[in-house]
Regions:
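Substrate-binding pocket helix/loop in short-chain dehydrogenase/reductase
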Residues: 97-99, 103-111, 193, 204
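Short, small/polar-rich loop/turn modules that mediate ligand/substrate recognition or access, typified
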Residues: 174, 179, 234-236
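Short C-terminal tail/terminal secondary-structure segment
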Residues: 96, 147, 224, 235-250
Length: 250
């Protein structure tokens, strides 16, 4: 097992990619704390992890609230003895709006959740990873952060910001044994993707080199790799799990 003896915190772990990430980490031996504002889903994910005979509990965590994040991380350290891996998966993606129709309150909310939330969680775990001399922070961005997205001013901006933050953390963390990387999913067959009208799903899938969406497990496998010692000399990278959507396809 790649992650035996490690303790991981996954934010946004109640459903979607965050849930699959948590399960994948547990399958490789990690104990996993599932953090979310939706406790029902977080508890369910945690129960699935416990069924794998791994230590796990769900924790209510609003990543926009610094004190709440700090308290949650302190609880993890107290109850599980360590915090080795952080997967920042909490995010909002629930609206499309061109620049003149973009609501200010949604712009501010997306900045708080997606970008400041990633900052808050990374900062909270940092002292423990620094003290131990080992840590892995994997941040979830998106190809929208590198390519832009029509009608996605707030979302693509926050994801681009996460990439910049990750590179800075990588520079600062390497001397302490803290590796920081960012995963950029493309078109993934997730719950939110399946809500899109079928004709739009088909059009988006055809933009990829594979002409089909990826699966949540494809993203989770990348995260497991980056969390492991197999990636010990990798930091500051932007890993696209995108099926080549950023390539010119025709």
């Amino acid at each position: 097992m790649l992650l035996k003896g490690k303790v991981a915190l996954v934010t946004g772990g109640s459903r979607g990619l965050g849930r699959v990430d948590g399960l994948a980490l547990a399958e490789e031996g990690a104990d996993v704390v599932v953090a979310d504002i939706v406790m029902e889903g977080a508890e369910k994910t945690s129960q699935e992890i416990q069924a794998m005979r791994k230590r796990s509990f769900a924790i209510k965590m609003d990543v926009t609230k610094k004190d709440e994040v700090k308290g949650g991380v302190e609880r993890i350290k107290k109850e599980l003895g360590s915090i080795d891996i952080l997967v920042n998966s909490a995010a909002t993606l629930d609206h499309l709006a061109q620049i003149l129709e973009q609501k200010d309150e949604l712009w501010e909310r997306d900045l708080r959740v997606n970008l400041t939330g990633t900052y808050n969680c990374s900062r909270a775990v940092w002292p423990y990873m620094k003290e131990k001399g080992w840590g892995r922070i994997i941040n979830m961005a998106s190809v929208a952060g590198t390519l832009g997205g029509f009608g996605q001013a707030s979302y693509s901006t926050t994801k681009a910001g996460i990439i910049g933050l990750t590179k800075t953390l990588a520079l600062e963390g390497a001397r302490y044994g803290i590796n920081c990387n960012v995963v950029c999913p493309g078109i993934i067959n997730s719950e939110s993707f399946r809500l899109i009208p079928p004709e739009m799903r088909e059009r988006l899938a055809k933009r990829t080199a594979f002409r089909k969406p990826g699966e949540p497990e494809d993203v989770a496998n990348a995260i497991v790799f980056l969390a492991s010692d197999k990636a010990k000399y990798i930091t500051g990278i932007v890993l696209n799990v995108s099926g080549g959507i950023e390539l010119f396809t025709f």
